[in-house]
Amino acid sequence: EKYGVEPTYANMREGWMYHIRDRVWLANRAALGLMHLGFTPPFTGDENLNPHWYQIDPQLINEIWAYTAPGMISYAAGKSDWAARITSDSWAVSPTVLYGAMYADAFFCKDIRKLITRALRELPADDRYAIAVKEMIALYDKYPKDWVKARQIMAKKYYIDEPAMTKTIWNANLNGLCGILAMLYGEGDFQRTLDLSCAMGFDCDNQAATISGLLGVMYGAKSLPESLTKPIEGWEKPFNDRYINITRFDIPDASIEDMIERTYNKAIELVCSKGGKVKGDMVYVNPKAQFIPPMEFCIGPNPDLEIGQPTDYSFACRTNADFKWELVKGKLPAGVTFQNGKLAGTPTEAGKYPITLQLSAN
């Protein structure tokens, strides 16, 4: 609402630094620390800078990028990739991309297996998580009535035998696979899927929340058991229609119905901005919409060159590398060139070399 339906990384950094002050862990905490050092995403999630780049973090806060883009599967996947890189990198981004695609598709697809396989189109065939998801589907086919066996095999390969560097209960790949198994063995039943999400273990509360939300989109609010949405006598609306904030600075308590209405309005705004339209009580979406990251400079470590040592420093990152980069002011050290947002060559002279760069659309 404050920054529009396609915020910039600079906007995200500003919001994070203002609202997130405590109760933050792992990749989120490391990213926030890097923001306070002056960095912007995606450098805050870079595997060379964020020691927790491989953790689950972006899967937990991803839904909004997708349920505001109903039916716009590729758009939701691309935006999820962009957002995940605030905290994460490499294969740890992939579960977030898959969830993003599934959330967007869930408005129209009611078949669990089809939902998963269609979302896999948004990941490269050789992606680590994509390969592992296909393994989970094969396990389900082999042991359709034995989720314990499937979970045992999955945990052996992706937790017990995981390389020491990335072996944690919060590993993004591991927990993303737990979610897939819960979906497959839950077979569309909300309570069973929720129970299985918890039974899979590891960082299970987060998988339970993500998968439960996904089923809610697929089958609607009426599919949710009242024993869960109205557990206290006297509640007339789900969860008593109250969101109570206890963890984020200067975020007010709110009516859940009001939050839904505001989110719906943002979804309509986004749909219409990407070629969709509203006609009467019907909303038409553009399923071919693509997410193009906002054009912006992203701030990472300053270049630190050494005489006689080759450099390949890049000001450009994956979200702005395709724009036009120009050196418009200043002088480079002898032996160094600038092209496509990158420094290359071997400096031969010491000194300070202030430069001004310009970024524009091609």
Residue ranges and their predicted role:
Residues 34-53, 62-73, 81-86, 96, ...:
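Accessory "access/gating" subregions that flank catalytic or transport cores
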Residues 91, 99, 104, 179-268:
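Catalytic phosphate/nucleotide-handling subdomain of diverse soluble enzymes
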Residues 126, 130-165, 221-296:
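Acidic, carboxylate-rich catalytic segments that either coordinate divalent cations
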Residues 294-324:
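Solvent-exposed, low-complexity, repeat-rich "mucin-like" stalks and linkers
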Residues 319-341:
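Surface-exposed or secretory-pathway low-complexity segments enriched in glycine-proline
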Residues 351-361:
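A short beta-strand micro-motif common to beta-rich folds, especially ectodomain repeats
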